[in-house]
Structure formats: C-alpha cells, structure tokens
C-alpha cells in the first residue's frame, strides 16, 4: 500500500539487488510485440515471423555490444538461474568424460552453489574457494586450486549481497593460461559495471533482464565462439539458439532485455555517477550519526549501488520491522526468508552476532536525493531507539564480551 508524504511515495524502494523497476522506455519498446507485432520469430514464411525475428536479432546485438561480444554468442534463456545451470551443467556434461573438477567460490549465488552440489552427487569434484575479509578471492589460492582435471572456474562479477567486484581480468588470465573455461555469473554486473568478455577472457557469462530495468522471465548466456566452447543443452526440442536452448523465443521479453541493455550501454556513465554520489551521501550521513556501523565488503572494489551495513547490537529483522517505510532486505532475496545469518558474511569471517545485524540497501537509477535524505533520517532515529531498548547494546557499551557470556537455559 503506497502512501504519500511531502511528494515522497512510501515505501521507498531500496532493494535494487532483488529486482529493478521496469524502465518506462523498455515498456514502450515491448508493447507492440504483445499486440500488433505478435509473430513467432521462428516462422520464416511470412512477414509476421520476419518482423519478430528482426527484433530478436537486433536485441541480441544490443546485449552483445554491452559486453564486447558477437551477437551469435548470445543465447536467450529464462533468466540468470537457468543461464548458470546451463553453463555449469552444460560444461560438466560435455567435457565430463575428459575432466571432472570445477572451481567456484563460497560466496557465489545460491543457484551456482546448488548446481555444483548437484554435480557433486554425480561424481564431479568441486573446490569452493574461500574469500578474504573484504569479500574478494585470493588469486594465489585460485592458481593453486587448478589441476589438470579442472574444466571450469565459476566466479561471479558482482556479489548480490555485498556488491564487491571480483578481479575478472586477472581470473580470466589465469584460466586462459591454464586452459580452463571461465564462467562468470554477471547478473549483478551486466549493465552496471564495465565488463568486456575478451579483455577478461570470459568464456561463459550469465545475464538477467530484471536486474537492469528490464522484464522478469528473460535472461541470456554468453557462450564464446572463438576459441569455441561447447555445452550440452538442458532442454531439448526444436533446436533453437544454436541447439543450446530449445523453445519458442518470447519476443516481447527479448525486446525488453535488448532495450534495457542499449539504455545501459548509453547511460552507464551517468547511472554510475548518480549511484556513486548517493552511496557517498548515504554512508557519510549514517556514519556521522550512528556509531559502530560496518560496511560489509571492500569499499572501493565494489558496485556502489549495494550497501550492506551491519548495525552492532540490533537484530536485522527488528531493523526491517522498524523501518517499514523502506523496502530493504537482510541478504539475498532468494534466502532472506530464513533467519540464518548470511552465508556470504559468515564466509568473510564476520562473526555471527554482527552478521545478524546486517541490512542490504540498494540504490539505483530511480533513487532520488530526497529519498536518501528521508531514509537516513528514519534509519538514524530507529537504530538509536532500538539500541536504547537493547540490553545487548548496553552490555557492549560497558565492554562486556557477549561471546563469553554463558546464557542460562530455562
């Protein structure tokens, strides 16, 4: 239920890592393909089909352009979860009779970790690399983990929970030198940070529409043609998408993804400037008014549309309830329904108490200065109020180490 306050529409959306609103320009581009331009892009005997096919191919080119790829290297899927599964399982199934080792990272998105666990049940060996306290992998540890049995390294571009950017160029160089395929889940990075698949030697990259102001239900997988990468399809049928992903293509959604990619290509610099300014404003204001607030993840090597903050002494769930006028989350939208502390924060070495106090704030293209001002004011008043009520905060101020307390059970 939306309410209005001094030209502000409440609640304020600050969960841009979970999803983004559809850019009105994207909606406008999509609409004709639901109504008058409804043809099947695989129908080659009449103008309805040709028109739809042209729109699909134009979108394919716009998506490729954003990552320095060729249009033919873009395979359409239903979203980044499918793309990640297709990349990881597709490589394992195609090359599995020659090699049987995959390397990924403990802080990857759930769908990458679950795809790898699924392959482990089928006999594939998986190494889960640790991350440093700043959320970034150690390149030496990666180098040492690669064996002659390694077929794939999968490392995400931008982390969905803490926003850190992994050193893709250096990872790609190591993989290319060792003759290992490099997959990157780029759902949170595509269209937000510069990614060049050739510069970074990326062989496979997963893309999502709804993370870049495009529609839900559409994504893509970049699959390198030179040197050629082969994958076994997960879905069999009419052989669409170079035989890698069968099924009639959803033209309106593809047009939406292509338009969103084109806008990102033209406006990335402007978006980055806007987001960086609001990030600095938000963080400086919070730090100046609240003590013991910790930014999770490297401050510089990050996409600044993601602020994951821990507020010592206050439970994350109680913060969310207290700041109902802000739409935020306590971690990945796919796992924030559980009361377990974030596995990403735990793998960075953040202790359990502090991990429980973390909130992820998302800033995006449509966030305004006025919204940031309101958010800061609300957060500061509520956090200070919650701390006044918290016996744990009081004990911390008295220098008592909460870890050493033996709590009585009743």
From Swiss-Prot:
Q: Supply the source organism for this entry.
A: Rickettsia bellii (strain RML369-C)
What's the stated role of this polypeptide? Answer: Master enzyme that delivers sulfur to a number of partners involved in Fe-S cluster assembly, tRNA modification or cofactor biosynthesis. Catalyzes the removal of elemental sulfur atoms from cysteine to produce alanine. Functions as a sulfur delivery protein for Fe-S cluster synthesis onto IscU, an Fe-S scaffold assembly protein, as well as other S acceptor proteins.
Active site location: 334
**Binding-site residues for [2Fe-2S] cluster, renumbered to this chain:** 334
Instruction: Give cofactor(s), names only.
Output: pyridoxal 5'-phosphate
* Pfam families xref list: Aminotran_5
Q: Which residues bind pyridoxal 5'-phosphate?
A: 80-81, 160, 188, 208-210, 248
Q: What is this protein called?
A: Cysteine desulfurase IscS
Q: Which GO terms describe its molecular function?
A: 2 iron, 2 sulfur cluster binding; cysteine desulfurase activity; metal ion binding; pyridoxal phosphate binding
Q: Name one GO biological process term.
A: [2Fe-2S] cluster assembly
The record's note on quaternary structure and interaction partners says:
Homodimer. Forms a heterotetramer with IscU, interacts with other sulfur acceptors.
**Reactions catalysed according to its record:** (sulfur carrier)-H + L-cysteine = (sulfur carrier)-SH + L-alanine
To which pathway does this protein belong? Cofactor biosynthesis; iron-sulfur cluster biosynthesis
- Output the Gene Ontology cellular-component terms: L-cysteine desulfurase complex
What are the EC numbers? 2.8.1.7
**Keywords for this protein:** 2Fe-2S, Cytoplasm, Iron, Iron-sulfur, Metal-binding, Pyridoxal phosphate, Transferase
Q: Please list the residues that carry the modification N6-(pyridoxal phosphate)lysine.
A: 211
Asked if Cytoplasm is a keyword of the record, the answer is: yes
């Amino acid at each position: 239920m939306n309410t209005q306050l001094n030209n502000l529409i409440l609640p304020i959306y600050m969960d841009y890592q979970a999803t983004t609103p559809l850019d009105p320009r994207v909606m406008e581009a999509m609409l004709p393909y639901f109504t008058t331009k409804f043809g099947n892009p695989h129908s080659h005997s009449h103008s309805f089909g040709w028109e739809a096919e042209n729109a699909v191919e134009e979108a394919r080119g716009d998506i490729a352009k954003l990552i320095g790829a060729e249009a033919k290297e873009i395979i359409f899927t239903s979203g980044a979860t499918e793309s990640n599964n297709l990349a990881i399982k597709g490589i394992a199934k195609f090359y599995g009779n020659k090699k049987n080792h995959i390397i990924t990272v403990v802080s990857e998105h759930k769908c990458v970790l679950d795809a790898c666990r699924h392959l482990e049940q089928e006999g594939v060996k998986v190494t889960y690399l640790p991350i440093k306290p700043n959320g970034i992998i150690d390149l030496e540890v990666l180098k040492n983990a690669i064996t002659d049995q390694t077929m794939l390294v999968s490392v995400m571009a931008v982390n969905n929970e803490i926003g850190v950017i992994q050193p893709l160029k250096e990872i790609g160089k190591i993989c290319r030198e060792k003759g290992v395929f490099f997959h990157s889940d780029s759902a949170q990075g595509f269209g937000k940070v510069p990614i060049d698949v050739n510069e970074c030697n990326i062989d496979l990259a997963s893309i999502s529409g709804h993370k870049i102001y495009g529609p839900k239900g559409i994504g893509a997988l970049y699959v390198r043609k030179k040197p050629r990468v082969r994958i076994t399809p997960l879905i069999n049928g009419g052989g669409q998408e170079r035989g890698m992903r069968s099924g009639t293509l959803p033209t309106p959604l593809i047009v939406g993804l292509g338009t969103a990619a084109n806008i990102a290509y033209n406006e990335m610099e402007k978006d980055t400037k806007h987001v960086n300014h609001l990030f600095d404003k938000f963080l400086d204001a919070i730090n100046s008014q609240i003590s013991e607030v910790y930014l999770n993840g490297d401050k510089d090597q990050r996409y600044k549309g993601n602020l994951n903050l821990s507020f010592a002494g206050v439970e994350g769930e109680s913060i969310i309830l207290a700041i109902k006028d802000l739409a935020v989350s306590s971690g990945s939208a796919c796992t924030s329904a559980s009361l377990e502390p974030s596995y990403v924060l735990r793998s960075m070495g953040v202790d359990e108490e502090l991990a429980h106090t973390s909130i992820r704030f998302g800033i995006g293209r449509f966030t305004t200065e006025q919204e940031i001002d309101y958010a800061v004011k609300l957060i500061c008043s509520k956090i200070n109020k919650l701390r006044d009520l918290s016996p744990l905060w009081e004990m911390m101020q008295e220098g008592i180490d909460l870890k050493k307390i033996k709590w009585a059970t009743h």
